[in-house]
């Protein structure tokens, strides 16, 4: 994969998000570089901001998205996040970025971003992606097969997923309309909570035998 091609696609994704109305509060200053020093900062949008006169280029910089993340895990995918924790200068900017690597037949399992809409562009490989609408919309599935250069949008708060349906690795980049979009992975949340949800509740909710629920909870707690 040519680096120049990736950078162009990343830039296009970022521009699309930046022209949209951000979900995070709009900044009232040029920038607000996040710091952990409580004595020399002003609290804005969940972070303390350093004195603007002390800001430097490194506060707005991240290096490493040219490197593939390890997919040696149960879901065979890896998400490399670039948000306000990696780039302090993103504070109050209402935008962040991720790189997603998928092994053959790997997936980014069903999850939601409670604070952001996501726009994803596929760089290489073949993905089956989709999201499910709310109960009020009868939980409709919106899904597509993506090829390199294709773009798909996941609305804020909607459960969505991506699956590599090809025999080769896949790579995607996604922009998110929040400096800290958050992520809730459905299976991990429901079956791996601390403390665990009462198995009887989940058995009734999912219409499963309680023994199956207990087995699922044991798997997701490990």
Swiss-Prot record:
Lineage: Eukaryota, Viridiplantae, Streptophyta, Embryophyta, Tracheophyta
Role according to the record: May play a role in plant defense. Probably has no oxalate oxidase activity even if the active site is conserved.
Residues spanning the signal sequence: 1-18
Quaternary structure note: Oligomer (believed to be a pentamer but probably hexamer).
Occurrences of domain Cupin type-1 (ranges): 63-214
GO terms assigned for molecular function: manganese ion binding
Location of the protein in the cell: Secreted, Extracellular space, Apoplast
Family: Belongs to the germin family.
Source organism per UniProt: Arabidopsis thaliana (Mouse-ear cress)
Sugar attachment sites: 78
Listed name of the protein: Germin-like protein subfamily 1 member 13
Cystine connections: 32-49
A Pfam cross-reference name: Cupin_1
Residues holding Mn(2+): 111, 113, 118, 160
GO cellular component: apoplast
Record flagged with keyword Oxidoreductase: no
Keywords: Apoplast, Disulfide bond, Glycoprotein, Manganese, Metal-binding, Secreted, Signal
SUPFAM superfamilies membership: RmlC-like cupins
